[in-house]
Amino acid sequence: MNHLANNYGYYPQDCRTQYSRMNSAEAELTSLPVHVSLQDRELWDKFSSIGTEMLITKSGRRMFPSCKVTVTGLNPKVKYVVIMDMVPFDNHKYKWNKDCWEVNGSSDPHLPNRFFIHPDSPAPGQKWMQYPISFHKLKLTNNTLNSNGLVVLHSMHKYQPRLHIVQSPDPCTPHNPGAYLRFTFPEAAFIAVTAYQNQEITKLKIDNNPFAKGFRDNGLNRKRFRDKGTQEMQDTDRQVKLDLTANECAAGMSQMVEDVDVSVSSSVDCRDTQNSSSVSLNPFISAFTNPSSAGGAAAHQTHTLLSLSNRHFSSPRESNLNSVCAALPVSQLSTGHTSFSRLNPQETHHNSRPKIQLQPPHPSLQCHDLDVRLPLPPKLSRVQLSESALRNLEMSPLSDCANPRPLTNILNRSCFRASTPSGKLLPNPPQPEQFLRGSEREIYPAVQEYTDQQFTLNSQTEHRPHMRPLTEY
């Protein structure tokens, strides 16, 4: 508690009005029992015990703890102006030596007339006494050229706050000077610094100041430390993204290679090749695995094979046909009841066959190795070929290329069906006999009569005891 008798003073007036120093306003203020007390005295005592420090910057820094005072004894109806400034505590300059402050010479000259006027001034005494007067907006600076109402101090000097209560002059007598009261607070003395020297002061301010977020985390409050940490986090995130992108690209390339290997393996549907359990769902693939499922249609099947050397430019490649033939089960190839030798293109045999409505596979599932997208050959699946027949197909003479024939094999019929609209089938597809002259047609015995016998087609010396007339075809 600062008593009026020890802190009372007069406001220095201009020399022209020195004669009016002792007036009625001064006498009135002197007669009042004005008392001023500093708030948060316990907190100030904690800082004072270890040496209070206050930061000063070029742009100005607020104090913590801030000065907050309570005033009593003022005239409720008289207006007052409340002002605060900082005055030197002593005539010394200080320095921090390891763990304590030491005197380091004489102080620099103090800069006078650096006041902070409370923003509520002037106000009647009733308002000043109603609530504590806070100076939390007061800022300290070391910029001597500052003119924005900041209090200018010297670094490494010790100061103490000083409060001025100035009675406003009477409007009727503007030249009449006003009296003032002055109060100092030694318990709030501090050393002005540009950076905290005592770590205990830093910790104490962090523990008690809810707005000291910048000093948390080991006191790394400067912008360069925050920017450095942010840059390191961004670099780490960027490196992680690059590593993930590289791994995804490598995985994508390996997946593309696997997809290419699967798609060019054969003209068979890739899903049927990879999943053996779904083979029975395709009626054409089921003929390879279960020949008996054809039922009575086996007696009306058509056997038409052409030499691969006579294929058309739009026909599938030889590698694709070999892959289709290689897909036949080995057990069926070895146990077949009928063996075939080399066949010429003109040696064909046709009977009536049931019309089955076929739909070509989806374009996305077809093999890209073919020049023309073809579905799986339906009739080739019912032919039981021996290994010798497959070798003969690959060893066709080159002389057959001189006399090319129309493709009447099973691949031609598949291409013809693929060119028709989906779900439709021509009622009378062209027969291979339409492309052969009458003298080139060969007559074959009925298949039903030789079901249990083995014979060889394309044999020039074969004895044919039962010949049917041409009119039956």
Swiss-Prot record:
Keywords: DNA-binding, Nucleus, Transcription, Transcription regulation
UniProt GO molecular function: DNA-binding transcription factor activity, RNA polymerase II-specific; RNA polymerase II cis-regulatory region sequence-specific DNA binding
Chain segments carrying region Disordered: 342-361
A matching Pfam family: T-box
InterPro entries: p53-like_TF_DNA-bd_sf (IPR008967), T-box_DNA-bd (IPR046360), T-box_sf (IPR036960), TF_T-box (IPR001699), TF_T-box_CS (IPR018186)
Entry function: Probable transcriptional regulator involved in developmental processes.
Domain of life: Eukaryota
Tissue and organ expression note: Exclusively expressed by ventral mesendoderm.
SMART domains: TBOX
PROSITE patterns: TBOX_1 (PS01283), TBOX_2 (PS01264), TBOX_3 (PS50252)
Entry's Gene Ontology BP terms: cell fate specification; paraxial mesoderm formation; positive regulation of DNA-templated transcription; regulation of transcription by RNA polymerase II; somite development
Name recorded for this polypeptide: T-box transcription factor TBX6L
GO cellular component, one term: chromatin
Principal location: nucleus
Localization of this protein: Nucleus
PANTHER family per the UniProt record, alphabetical: T-BOX PROTEIN-RELATED, T-BOX TRANSCRIPTION FACTOR TBX6L
DNA-binding region: 43-217
